[in-house]
Amino acid sequence: VSLEPCSHYGKTPPCADLIIEKQIPRIVIGCRDPFSKVAGRGIQKLKDAGREVIVGVLETECRQLIRRFITFHTLRRPYITLKWAESSDRYIDYSRTDGKPVILSSPLTSMLVHKKRAEHSAILVGTRTAELDNPGLNVRHWYGRSPVRIVLDRQQKLSPSLHLFDGSVPTLVFTEIPHAPLPVSYTHLRAHETRRHLV
């Protein structure tokens, strides 16, 4: 297995108990679970039940497979993916005020962007992107759940008529204005269980 079998009751019963119950004699584990409720307890439970346990096989590859989980539990922050599109002459955008987005993506890359959105818990943009592109930041060209939308609107100047505020997906706005009537702390992101952010 890529990750140490759990030894506690969460959303499901302990995986270690099932392995013991099914009398699996040898367990090969890629990496230890950094989650505080497991953190070696699953391995110990298996050993105490007389099972042979080998830990660290293809550990680097296993950690890469579960990098979002590892980042969340070791660094106490979301796994962040940076995404941008640029033209062949290395431009990201041109000066404009018309609210029409610059299309730099092909239909295939657009689909892949929506796939990435579906794989992330939240997506973040700044004020200028919100104003100029009026993006929905939802999942349309792929299947899956749309991420929570996060907007950095320092002066709280965005129009409530933007697609970001259509109510179809939760939107969090971060501002510098004291006592702003909007969620402004990281605890709101934790409440939404945002563990993977696309920026």
Annotate each PLM feature:
Residues 71, 79-190:
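Active-site ligand-binding patch in enzyme domains
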Residues 37, 63-65, 133-135:
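Short secondary-structure boundary/hinge segments and terminal tails
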Residues 66-76:
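Flexible, polar/acidic helix-loop-strand segments at domain edges
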Residues 188-199:
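Single conserved hydrophobic/aromatic residue that forms the stacking wall/gate
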Residues 12-13, 40, 59, 63-67, ...:
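Structural motif corresponding to alpha-helix initiation and N-cap regions
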Residues 18, 45, 64, 68, ...:
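Alpha-helical scaffold segments in soluble metabolic enzymes
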Residues 7, 35, 130-131, 158, ...:
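Glycine-rich nucleotide phosphate-binding loop and flanking beta-alpha elements
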Residues 1-61, 148, 176-177:
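Zn2+-dependent cytidine deaminase-like catalytic core
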